[in-house]
């Protein structure tokens, strides 16, 4: 990479060394870690996450194949950093984030980053960013906002968390086909209060599951993974847990779903098959199979019964017409999030905007592979009056970069797992630290985060059984 005029031997932001190694994610599989050191000694360490249910259009995560680690090793990606990327960015000003990212994209030369690996490129992108922030003595979120994304304004919006309390689909070995059942503390006024509410509902749910003789095993993202008969049963249990914790459904705590419908879409049948429920004998194959229209109607019915404010990947990632229909039908009151459809790709997100396919985009750094392209996607969504939800992956690490990213871009929402497993809690603890640091400059919007919906978080028509002692909305 060509050096710029701003770079000299005396420039404290000059990249001095780049070193990558193989670390482990929360599932015990290898992942890429990278350390970038600047001339002044400032260090930036990054660790890349990995998904279980992945979109067809994601940038390529380079794995070794073979027998070691069941083919999941990442020594190829590590070597690409140490031998191909690192040597070419030595001496470059670390604040040139966009130029460094664009150089790595050009060096790779493929549309999906298949040559060097998106996991290799992202590890360097994140580590460079963190090293520069440390050198300038700026919190990471502030550095990203002011120096990388060029965000204007003094206030930062803290994200409303989507907490995955019941896991299914590819994230759990149980009978539920929908992948994530989440709670959102929309009635809170601060991040601290939001996480208090989330913790209390989470533990109330655990007590409820035990009382009803369900197992309380955990899925990949820290939520419970009981064998349930339907999405309704999961939502009923969540509703009861909210009431047991002393909160009001819809007003204090709303629900969000990640259907991950591509995982149970049958190309052969051109239909959606709840295969886990069918395999368990809960549903016959006939009753467990739905057309696009039937699945849309089913999702609409769920939003009428429960305080669901967000549905992610309600249909197959390539079912553009179906997504348009879903958004047209319930998109005024429910956030319709595209994950696998867009894969944090600016071009695909622009296509979705032009079609009004959804009204929100999920943001996953490793789907696209650079911080620069991630910011581009968020900006495309915001310009279209869409929301953007910053997200973790099921194979996570203790790296809390996404917490800073959500605050830096004021996305207003973050999806980063349940109230268990330290790789998930690391993000929440980071958000608490940011809130304390910002003081009165920190804004938590609650239900107002759904700025493009007309009537979010409506009170559900279906109410759970009352708590033994009358539940009151906690203030």
From Swiss-Prot:
<feature type="binding site">
    <location>
        <position position="364"/>
    </location>
    <ligand>
        <name>(2R)-2-phosphoglycerate</name>
    </ligand>
</feature>
<comment type="function">
    <text>'Moonlights' as a plasminogen receptor. Binds host (chicken) plasminogen; enolase antiserum inhibits M.gallisepticum adherence to chicken embryo fibroblasts.</text>
</comment>
<feature type="active site" description="Proton acceptor">
    <location>
        <position position="364"/>
    </location>
</feature>
<feature type="binding site">
    <location>
        <position position="415"/>
    </location>
    <ligand>
        <name>(2R)-2-phosphoglycerate</name>
    </ligand>
</feature>
<dbReference type="GO" id="GO:0000287">
    <property type="term" value="F:magnesium ion binding"/>
</dbReference>
<dbReference type="GO" id="GO:0006096">
    <property type="term" value="P:glycolytic process"/>
</dbReference>
<feature type="binding site">
    <location>
        <position position="393"/>
    </location>
    <ligand>
        <name>(2R)-2-phosphoglycerate</name>
    </ligand>
</feature>
<dbReference type="InterPro" id="IPR020810">
    <property type="entry name" value="Enolase_C"/>
</dbReference>
<dbReference type="InterPro" id="IPR020811">
    <property type="entry name" value="Enolase_N"/>
</dbReference>
<keyword id="KW-0479">Metal-binding</keyword>
<keyword id="KW-0324">Glycolysis</keyword>
<feature type="compositionally biased region" description="Basic residues">
    <location>
        <begin position="463"/>
        <end position="475"/>
    </location>
</feature>
<feature type="binding site">
    <location>
        <position position="339"/>
    </location>
    <ligand>
        <name>Mg(2+)</name>
    </ligand>
</feature>
<comment type="function">
    <text>Catalyzes the reversible conversion of 2-phosphoglycerate (2-PG) into phosphoenolpyruvate (PEP). It is essential for the degradation of carbohydrates via glycolysis.</text>
</comment>
<dbReference type="GO" id="GO:0005576">
    <property type="term" value="C:extracellular region"/>
</dbReference>
<dbReference type="InterPro" id="IPR000941">
    <property type="entry name" value="Enolase"/>
</dbReference>
<dbReference type="GO" id="GO:0005886">
    <property type="term" value="C:plasma membrane"/>
</dbReference>
<feature type="active site" description="Proton donor">
    <location>
        <position position="221"/>
    </location>
</feature>
<dbReference type="Pfam" id="PF00113">
    <property type="entry name" value="Enolase_C"/>
</dbReference>
<keyword id="KW-0130">Cell adhesion</keyword>
<feature type="binding site">
    <location>
        <position position="179"/>
    </location>
    <ligand>
        <name>(2R)-2-phosphoglycerate</name>
    </ligand>
</feature>
<dbReference type="InterPro" id="IPR029017">
    <property type="entry name" value="Enolase-like_N"/>
</dbReference>
<dbReference type="Pfam" id="PF03952">
    <property type="entry name" value="Enolase_N"/>
</dbReference>
<feature type="binding site">
    <location>
        <position position="394"/>
    </location>
    <ligand>
        <name>(2R)-2-phosphoglycerate</name>
    </ligand>
</feature>
<keyword id="KW-0460">Magnesium</keyword>
<protein>
    <recommendedName>
        <fullName>Enolase</fullName>
        <ecNumber>4.2.1.11</ecNumber>
    </recommendedName>
</protein>
<dbReference type="GO" id="GO:0000015">
    <property type="term" value="C:phosphopyruvate hydratase complex"/>
</dbReference>
<keyword id="KW-0964">Secreted</keyword>
<dbReference type="GO" id="GO:0004634">
    <property type="term" value="F:phosphopyruvate hydratase activity"/>
</dbReference>
<comment type="similarity">
    <text>Belongs to the enolase family.</text>
</comment>
<dbReference type="GO" id="GO:0007155">
    <property type="term" value="P:cell adhesion"/>
</dbReference>
<dbReference type="GO" id="GO:0009986">
    <property type="term" value="C:cell surface"/>
</dbReference>
<feature type="region of interest" description="Disordered">
    <location>
        <begin position="454"/>
        <end position="475"/>
    </location>
</feature>
<keyword id="KW-0456">Lyase</keyword>
<dbReference type="InterPro" id="IPR020809">
    <property type="entry name" value="Enolase_CS"/>
</dbReference>
<keyword id="KW-0963">Cytoplasm</keyword>
<comment type="pathway">
    <text>Carbohydrate degradation; glycolysis; pyruvate from D-glyceraldehyde 3-phosphate: step 4/5.</text>
</comment>
<feature type="binding site">
    <location>
        <position position="258"/>
    </location>
    <ligand>
        <name>Mg(2+)</name>
    </ligand>
</feature>
<feature type="binding site">
    <location>
        <position position="312"/>
    </location>
    <ligand>
        <name>Mg(2+)</name>
    </ligand>
</feature>
<keyword id="KW-0472">Membrane</keyword>
<dbReference type="InterPro" id="IPR036849">
    <property type="entry name" value="Enolase-like_C_sf"/>
</dbReference>
<keyword id="KW-1003">Cell membrane</keyword>
């Amino acid at each position: 990479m060509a050096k710029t005029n701003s770079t000299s031997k005396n420039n404290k932001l000059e990249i001095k060394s780049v070193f990558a190694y193989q670390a482990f994610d929360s599932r015990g599989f290898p992942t890429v870690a990278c350390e970038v050191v600047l001339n002044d000694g400032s260090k930036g360490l990054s660790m890349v996450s990995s998904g279980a249910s992945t979109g067809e259009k994601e940038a390529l995560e380079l794995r070794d194949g073979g027998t070691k680690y069941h083919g999941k090793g990442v020594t190829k990606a590590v070597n690409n950093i140490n031998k191909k990327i690192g040597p070419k960015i030595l001496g470059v000003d670390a604040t040139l984030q966009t130029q460094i990212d664009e150089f790595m994209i050009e060096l790779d030369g493929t549309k999906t980053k298949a040559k060097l690996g998106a996991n290799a490129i992202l590890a360097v992108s994140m580590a460079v960013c963190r090293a520069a922030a440390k050198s300038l003595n700026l919190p990471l979120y502030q550095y990203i906002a002011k120096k990388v994304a060029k965000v204007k304004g003094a206030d930062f919006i803290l994200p409303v968390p989507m907490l995955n309390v019941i896991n299914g689909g590819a994230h759990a070995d149980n009978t539920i086909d929908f992948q994530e059942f989440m709670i959102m503390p929309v009635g809170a006024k601060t991040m601290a209060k939001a996480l208090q509410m989330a913790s209390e509902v989470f533990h109330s749910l655990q007590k409820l599951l035990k009382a009803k003789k369900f197992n309380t095993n955990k899925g990949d993202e820290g939520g419970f993974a009981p064998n349930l008969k339907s999405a309704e049963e999961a939502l009923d249990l969540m509703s009861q847990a909210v009431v047991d914790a002393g909160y009001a459904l819809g007003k204090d705590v709303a629900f969000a779903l990640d259907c991950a419908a591509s995982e149970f879409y049958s190309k052969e049948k051109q239909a959606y098959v709840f295969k886990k429920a069918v395999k368990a004998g809960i549903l016959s194959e006939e009753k467990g199979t739905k057309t696009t229209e039937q699945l849309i109607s089913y999702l609409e019915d769920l939003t009428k019964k429960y305080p669901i404010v967000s549905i992610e990947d309600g249909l197959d990632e390539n079912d553009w017409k179906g997504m348009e229909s879903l958004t047209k039908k319930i998109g005024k009151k429910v956030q319709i999030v595209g994950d696998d459809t867009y894969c944090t790709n600016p071009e695909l997100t622009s296509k979705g905007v032009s079609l009004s396919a959804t009204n929100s985009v999920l943001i996953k750094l490793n789907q696209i592979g650079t911080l620069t392209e991630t910011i581009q996607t968020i900006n495309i969504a915001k310009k279209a009056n869409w929301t953007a939800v910053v997200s973790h992956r099921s194979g996570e690490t203790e790296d809390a970069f996404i917490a800073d990213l959500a605050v830096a871009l004021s996305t207003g929402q973050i999806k980063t797992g349940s109230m268990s497993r330290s790789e998930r809690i690391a993000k929440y603890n980071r958000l608490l630290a940011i809130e304390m640091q910002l003081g009165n400059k920190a804004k938590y919007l609650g239900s107002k985060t759904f700025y493009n919906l007309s009537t979010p978080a409506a009170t559900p028509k279906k109410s759970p059984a009352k708590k033994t002692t009358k539940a009151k909305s906690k203030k």
